[in-house]
Amino acid sequence: MTENITTETRPSIYGLTRDQLIEWAIENGEKKFRATQVWDWLYRKRVQSFEEMSNLSAVFIDKLNEAFILNPLEQVVVQESADGTVKYLFMLPDKVMIETVLMRQSYGLSVCVTTQVGCNMGCTFCASGILKKERDVTAGEIVSQIMLVQKYFDERGLDERVSHVVVMGIGEPFDNYEHLMNFLRVINDDNGLAIGARHITVSTCGFMPAKIKEFAHENLQINLAISLHAPNNELRTSLMRITRNAPLEKLFEAIDYYTETTNRRVTYEYIMLSGENDSPEIAQQLADLIKPRNKLSYVNLIPYNPVAEHIKYERSTKDNTAKFYDVLKKNGINCVVRQEHGTDIDAACGQLRSKQIKKNKAKLA
């Protein structure tokens, strides 16, 4: 796998799985246990440089420095919310920027990672797609987001660790499938960060139903979420243009294949847009769509975070959201209204990045 696609000629070592690191070490004249030592320094001791790996020879450290960098991300902006949510803006070696979000949950620290610089999916309500995709984020750069968030707590002497990960940041994860899978295997490794598969969720808009089928055979018990947002093709196409090429019939054929293959539940994300997709009639359509597969389904109703560039959309009222929820519950649909995080900072995914890029352009003008 080609890990590096930036101006930095060396890839991040975080992009290697443990088996890949062992293979590299042996190819470079080192014993297998040396790679295991490096892995331990990276993920258990969480050092910030190869020079800190005190049980390695100077020759081996030189080899590591010649072949890899550690963390390729530079922290640009940090926004902290009153509820404990932290939003980070990171710069990559080629000066493009990505967002990462830490959310404090009752069950631990959850991090939302970004998989692409910009997004081409064209969802009309989303801040992430305002700036189009420039490139994929490499596996090492995705892992680095987790490592820098963990460093944030380590440096403050806080005995807390990242325990949950959601792949719901900027970009479409299944459009960066190879790097996504390497990232998942790195963070799920029991000898490393050891983030349990059932504590990891990957979200897709379903633009490539075939990838959902492929994901079913990865032999990982990672949670799958579908960005649905509408129960019929006409409405969904108006909100998500990818529906033209991946209509609901194709999407749900792939979802049914996934659930039959894995026997794992699928979460459906549904953003509540006032006057667009929040009527009781639409709720009944959604219930009718989910009901045949309700045993392995869960609907997540999401309050909309307004985006300046998308002024036509407003958040559903609490009353309309409650009525929508009630229709689903009366139909026996497993559902919840998502708890909000970070409402006093740039809450919408992609908003912080968009603002910073505008600031940078204004400085150059």
From Swiss-Prot:
Additional observations: Reaction proceeds by a ping-pong mechanism involving intermediate methylation of a conserved cysteine residue.
Keywords from the named record: 4Fe-4S, Cytoplasm, Disulfide bond, Iron, Iron-sulfur, Metal-binding, Methyltransferase, rRNA processing, S-adenosyl-L-methionine, Transferase, tRNA processing
Gene that this polypeptide is encoded by: rlmN
Example of a GO cellular component annotation carried by this entry: cytoplasm
Major place of residence: cytoplasm
Domain of life: Bacteria
Gene3D superfamilies registered for this protein in UniProt: 1.10.150.530, Aldolase class I
Cofactor note: Binds 1 [4Fe-4S] cluster. The cluster is coordinated with 3 cysteines and an exchangeable S-adenosyl-L-methionine.
PANTHER family found in the cross-reference section: 23S RRNA METHYLTRANSFERASE, RADICAL SAM CORE DOMAIN-CONTAINING PROTEIN
Similarity comment: family membership: Belongs to the radical SAM superfamily. RlmN family.
Subcellular location: Cytoplasm
Pfam families per UniProt: Radical_SAM, RlmN_N
Official protein name in the record: Probable dual-specificity RNA methyltransferase RlmN
Key word Disulfide bond present: yes
Leading EC class: transferase
Domain Radical SAM core: 105-344
InterPro entries according to UniProt: Aldolase_TIM, Methyltransferase_A, RlmN_N, RNA_MTrfase_RlmN, rRNA_lsu_MTrfase_RlmN/Cfr, rSAM
